[in-house]
Amino acid sequence: RVDGVARKLPDFVWPRTGSGTTYFIKAIIRHLERLGVVMINGSDAIDNVKDKLYSQQILGQSSLPVPKTMLVKHPINVSLVEKNVKYPMIIKTLSGSYGSGVFMVEDRKQFRQLMKMAELSNARYNIIIQECVEDSLGRDLRVLVVNGKVVGCMMRQSIDGDFRANITRGGEAIPYQIDEDIEWIGGECARLLDLDI
């Protein structure tokens, strides 16, 4: 039933709710799965990718190259962070999209300023700190995998010098040649995260 009216079940559903996936949305997805509706990227896959740390943990258990990552909470022990992750470092909120909640910190002063700003705004949430992969600053690859097969690749590239390559932040997308490494990494990521697409 939708708004009290009986409706025919869809043949399939491809949830595209991203970081906005709420408990309510997940409950609907699980309900439809249990009714036999085919889900493209079902509830398990959504659980795997909605939380950036959880995704990182899944990928980190494999032989895939992943950046060193820490989960921290307020108050943050700066010395402990610096022992494990060198500057520059990337700081992220656990969920988010379009480059929001992602910051590059180049030194201890910037780190302390960002943490102070978080404290002043009562942002006492957990954050991820990652090593900066300097070769990828301002660009990243997006690999399209469908049912385990790599079918396309694009490079997102910042055009204004930002370290983030998000299209919504003014970046551009250009076709990118698939090689063996890209095919293997893309396919493995999709497999490990249980993604259909």
Task: Name the predicted role of every residue range.
Residues 1-9, 21-22:
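Glycine-rich, highly charged phosphate/nucleotide-binding loops
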Residues 4-8, 32-36, 40, 44-138:
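Active-site nucleotide/adenylate-binding loops and adjacent lid/helix of ATP-dependent enzymes
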Residues 14-15:
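Redox-cofactor binding/interface segments in oxidoreductases and associated redox assembly factors
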Residues 18-20, 95-96:
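Short glycine-rich anion-binding loops that position phosphate/pyrophosphate groups of nucleotides
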Residues 25-31:
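A short acidic, amphipathic alpha-helical/loop segment
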Residues 28, 78, 186:
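Aromatic/hydrophobic pocket-lining residues that form π-stacking "cages" and hydrophobic walls in ligand
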Residues 103-189:
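Phosphate-binding site of ATP-dependent enzymes
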Residues 194-196:
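Phosphate/ribose-recognition catalytic cores of enzymes acting on nucleotide-derived substrates
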